């Protein structure tokens, strides 16, 4: 077996040998019974993992984290809605930009790099910038 470099980035992520082996097989059709059952099982397991009620609908997003962030913004905010983003680095900056692209008035509260965002600062900023999200 050939050694490959260890990924130490936010994504894509390392996968187990079993998952890699599954990828080595033929690509199933989107209506294949085995794929439908695997999808149903994954949704069931997600509900159990998150202790979600039966009526909750989890989603498997076959895309990047940015796609999931964009989906959340598209479904949670509209033009003129206000949102407060706690700035913790690159991905929170990206979330604020995505919210703005969906028309939201996104405010940020941050701290110096390497420092935590103070809870009091979040409270103060949320009082100044009352937000729907």
Please provide the spans of the model-predicted regions.
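A glycine-/small-polar-enriched, mobile loop at the entrance of the PLP active site in fold-type I
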Residues: 4-62
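Generic hydrophobic alpha-helical segments
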Residues: 42, 46, 72, 122-126
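Gly/Ser-rich phosphate-binding catalytic loop and adjacent alpha/beta segment
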Residues: 85-125
């Amino acid at each position: 077996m050939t050694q490959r470099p260890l990924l130490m980035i936010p994504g894509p992520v390392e996968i187990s040998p079993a998952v890699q082996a599954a990828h080595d097989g033929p690509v199933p059709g989107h209506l294949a019974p085995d794929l439908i059952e695997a999808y149903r099982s994954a949704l069931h397991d997600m509900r159990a993992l998150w202790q979600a009620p039966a009526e909750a609908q989890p989603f498997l997003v076959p895309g990047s984290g940015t796609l999931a962030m964009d989906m959340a913004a598209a479904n949670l905010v509209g033009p003129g809605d206000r949102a407060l983003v706690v700035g913790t680095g690159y991905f929170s900056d990206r979330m604020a930009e995505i919210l703005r692209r969906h028309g939201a008035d996104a405010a940020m509260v941050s701290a110096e790099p390497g420092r935590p965002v103070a809870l009091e600062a979040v409270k103060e900023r949320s009082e100044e910038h009352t937000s729907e999200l």
